[in-house]
Swiss-Prot record:
The lineage of its organism: Eukaryota, Metazoa, Ecdysozoa, Arthropoda, Hexapoda. The modification Leucine amide is found at residue 8. GO terms for biological process: neuropeptide signaling pathway. Transmembrane segments: none annotated. It comes from Namaquaphasma ookiepense (Gladiator bug). This is Extended FMRFamide-5. Belongs to the FARP (FMRF amide related peptide) family. Disulfide bonds: none annotated. One of its GO terms (cellular component) is extracellular region. Its main location: secreted.
């Protein structure tokens, strides 16, 4: 998932 990306 792009959860890490959404963290930005």
């Amino acid at each position: 998932t792009d959860r890490n990306f959404l963290r930005l």
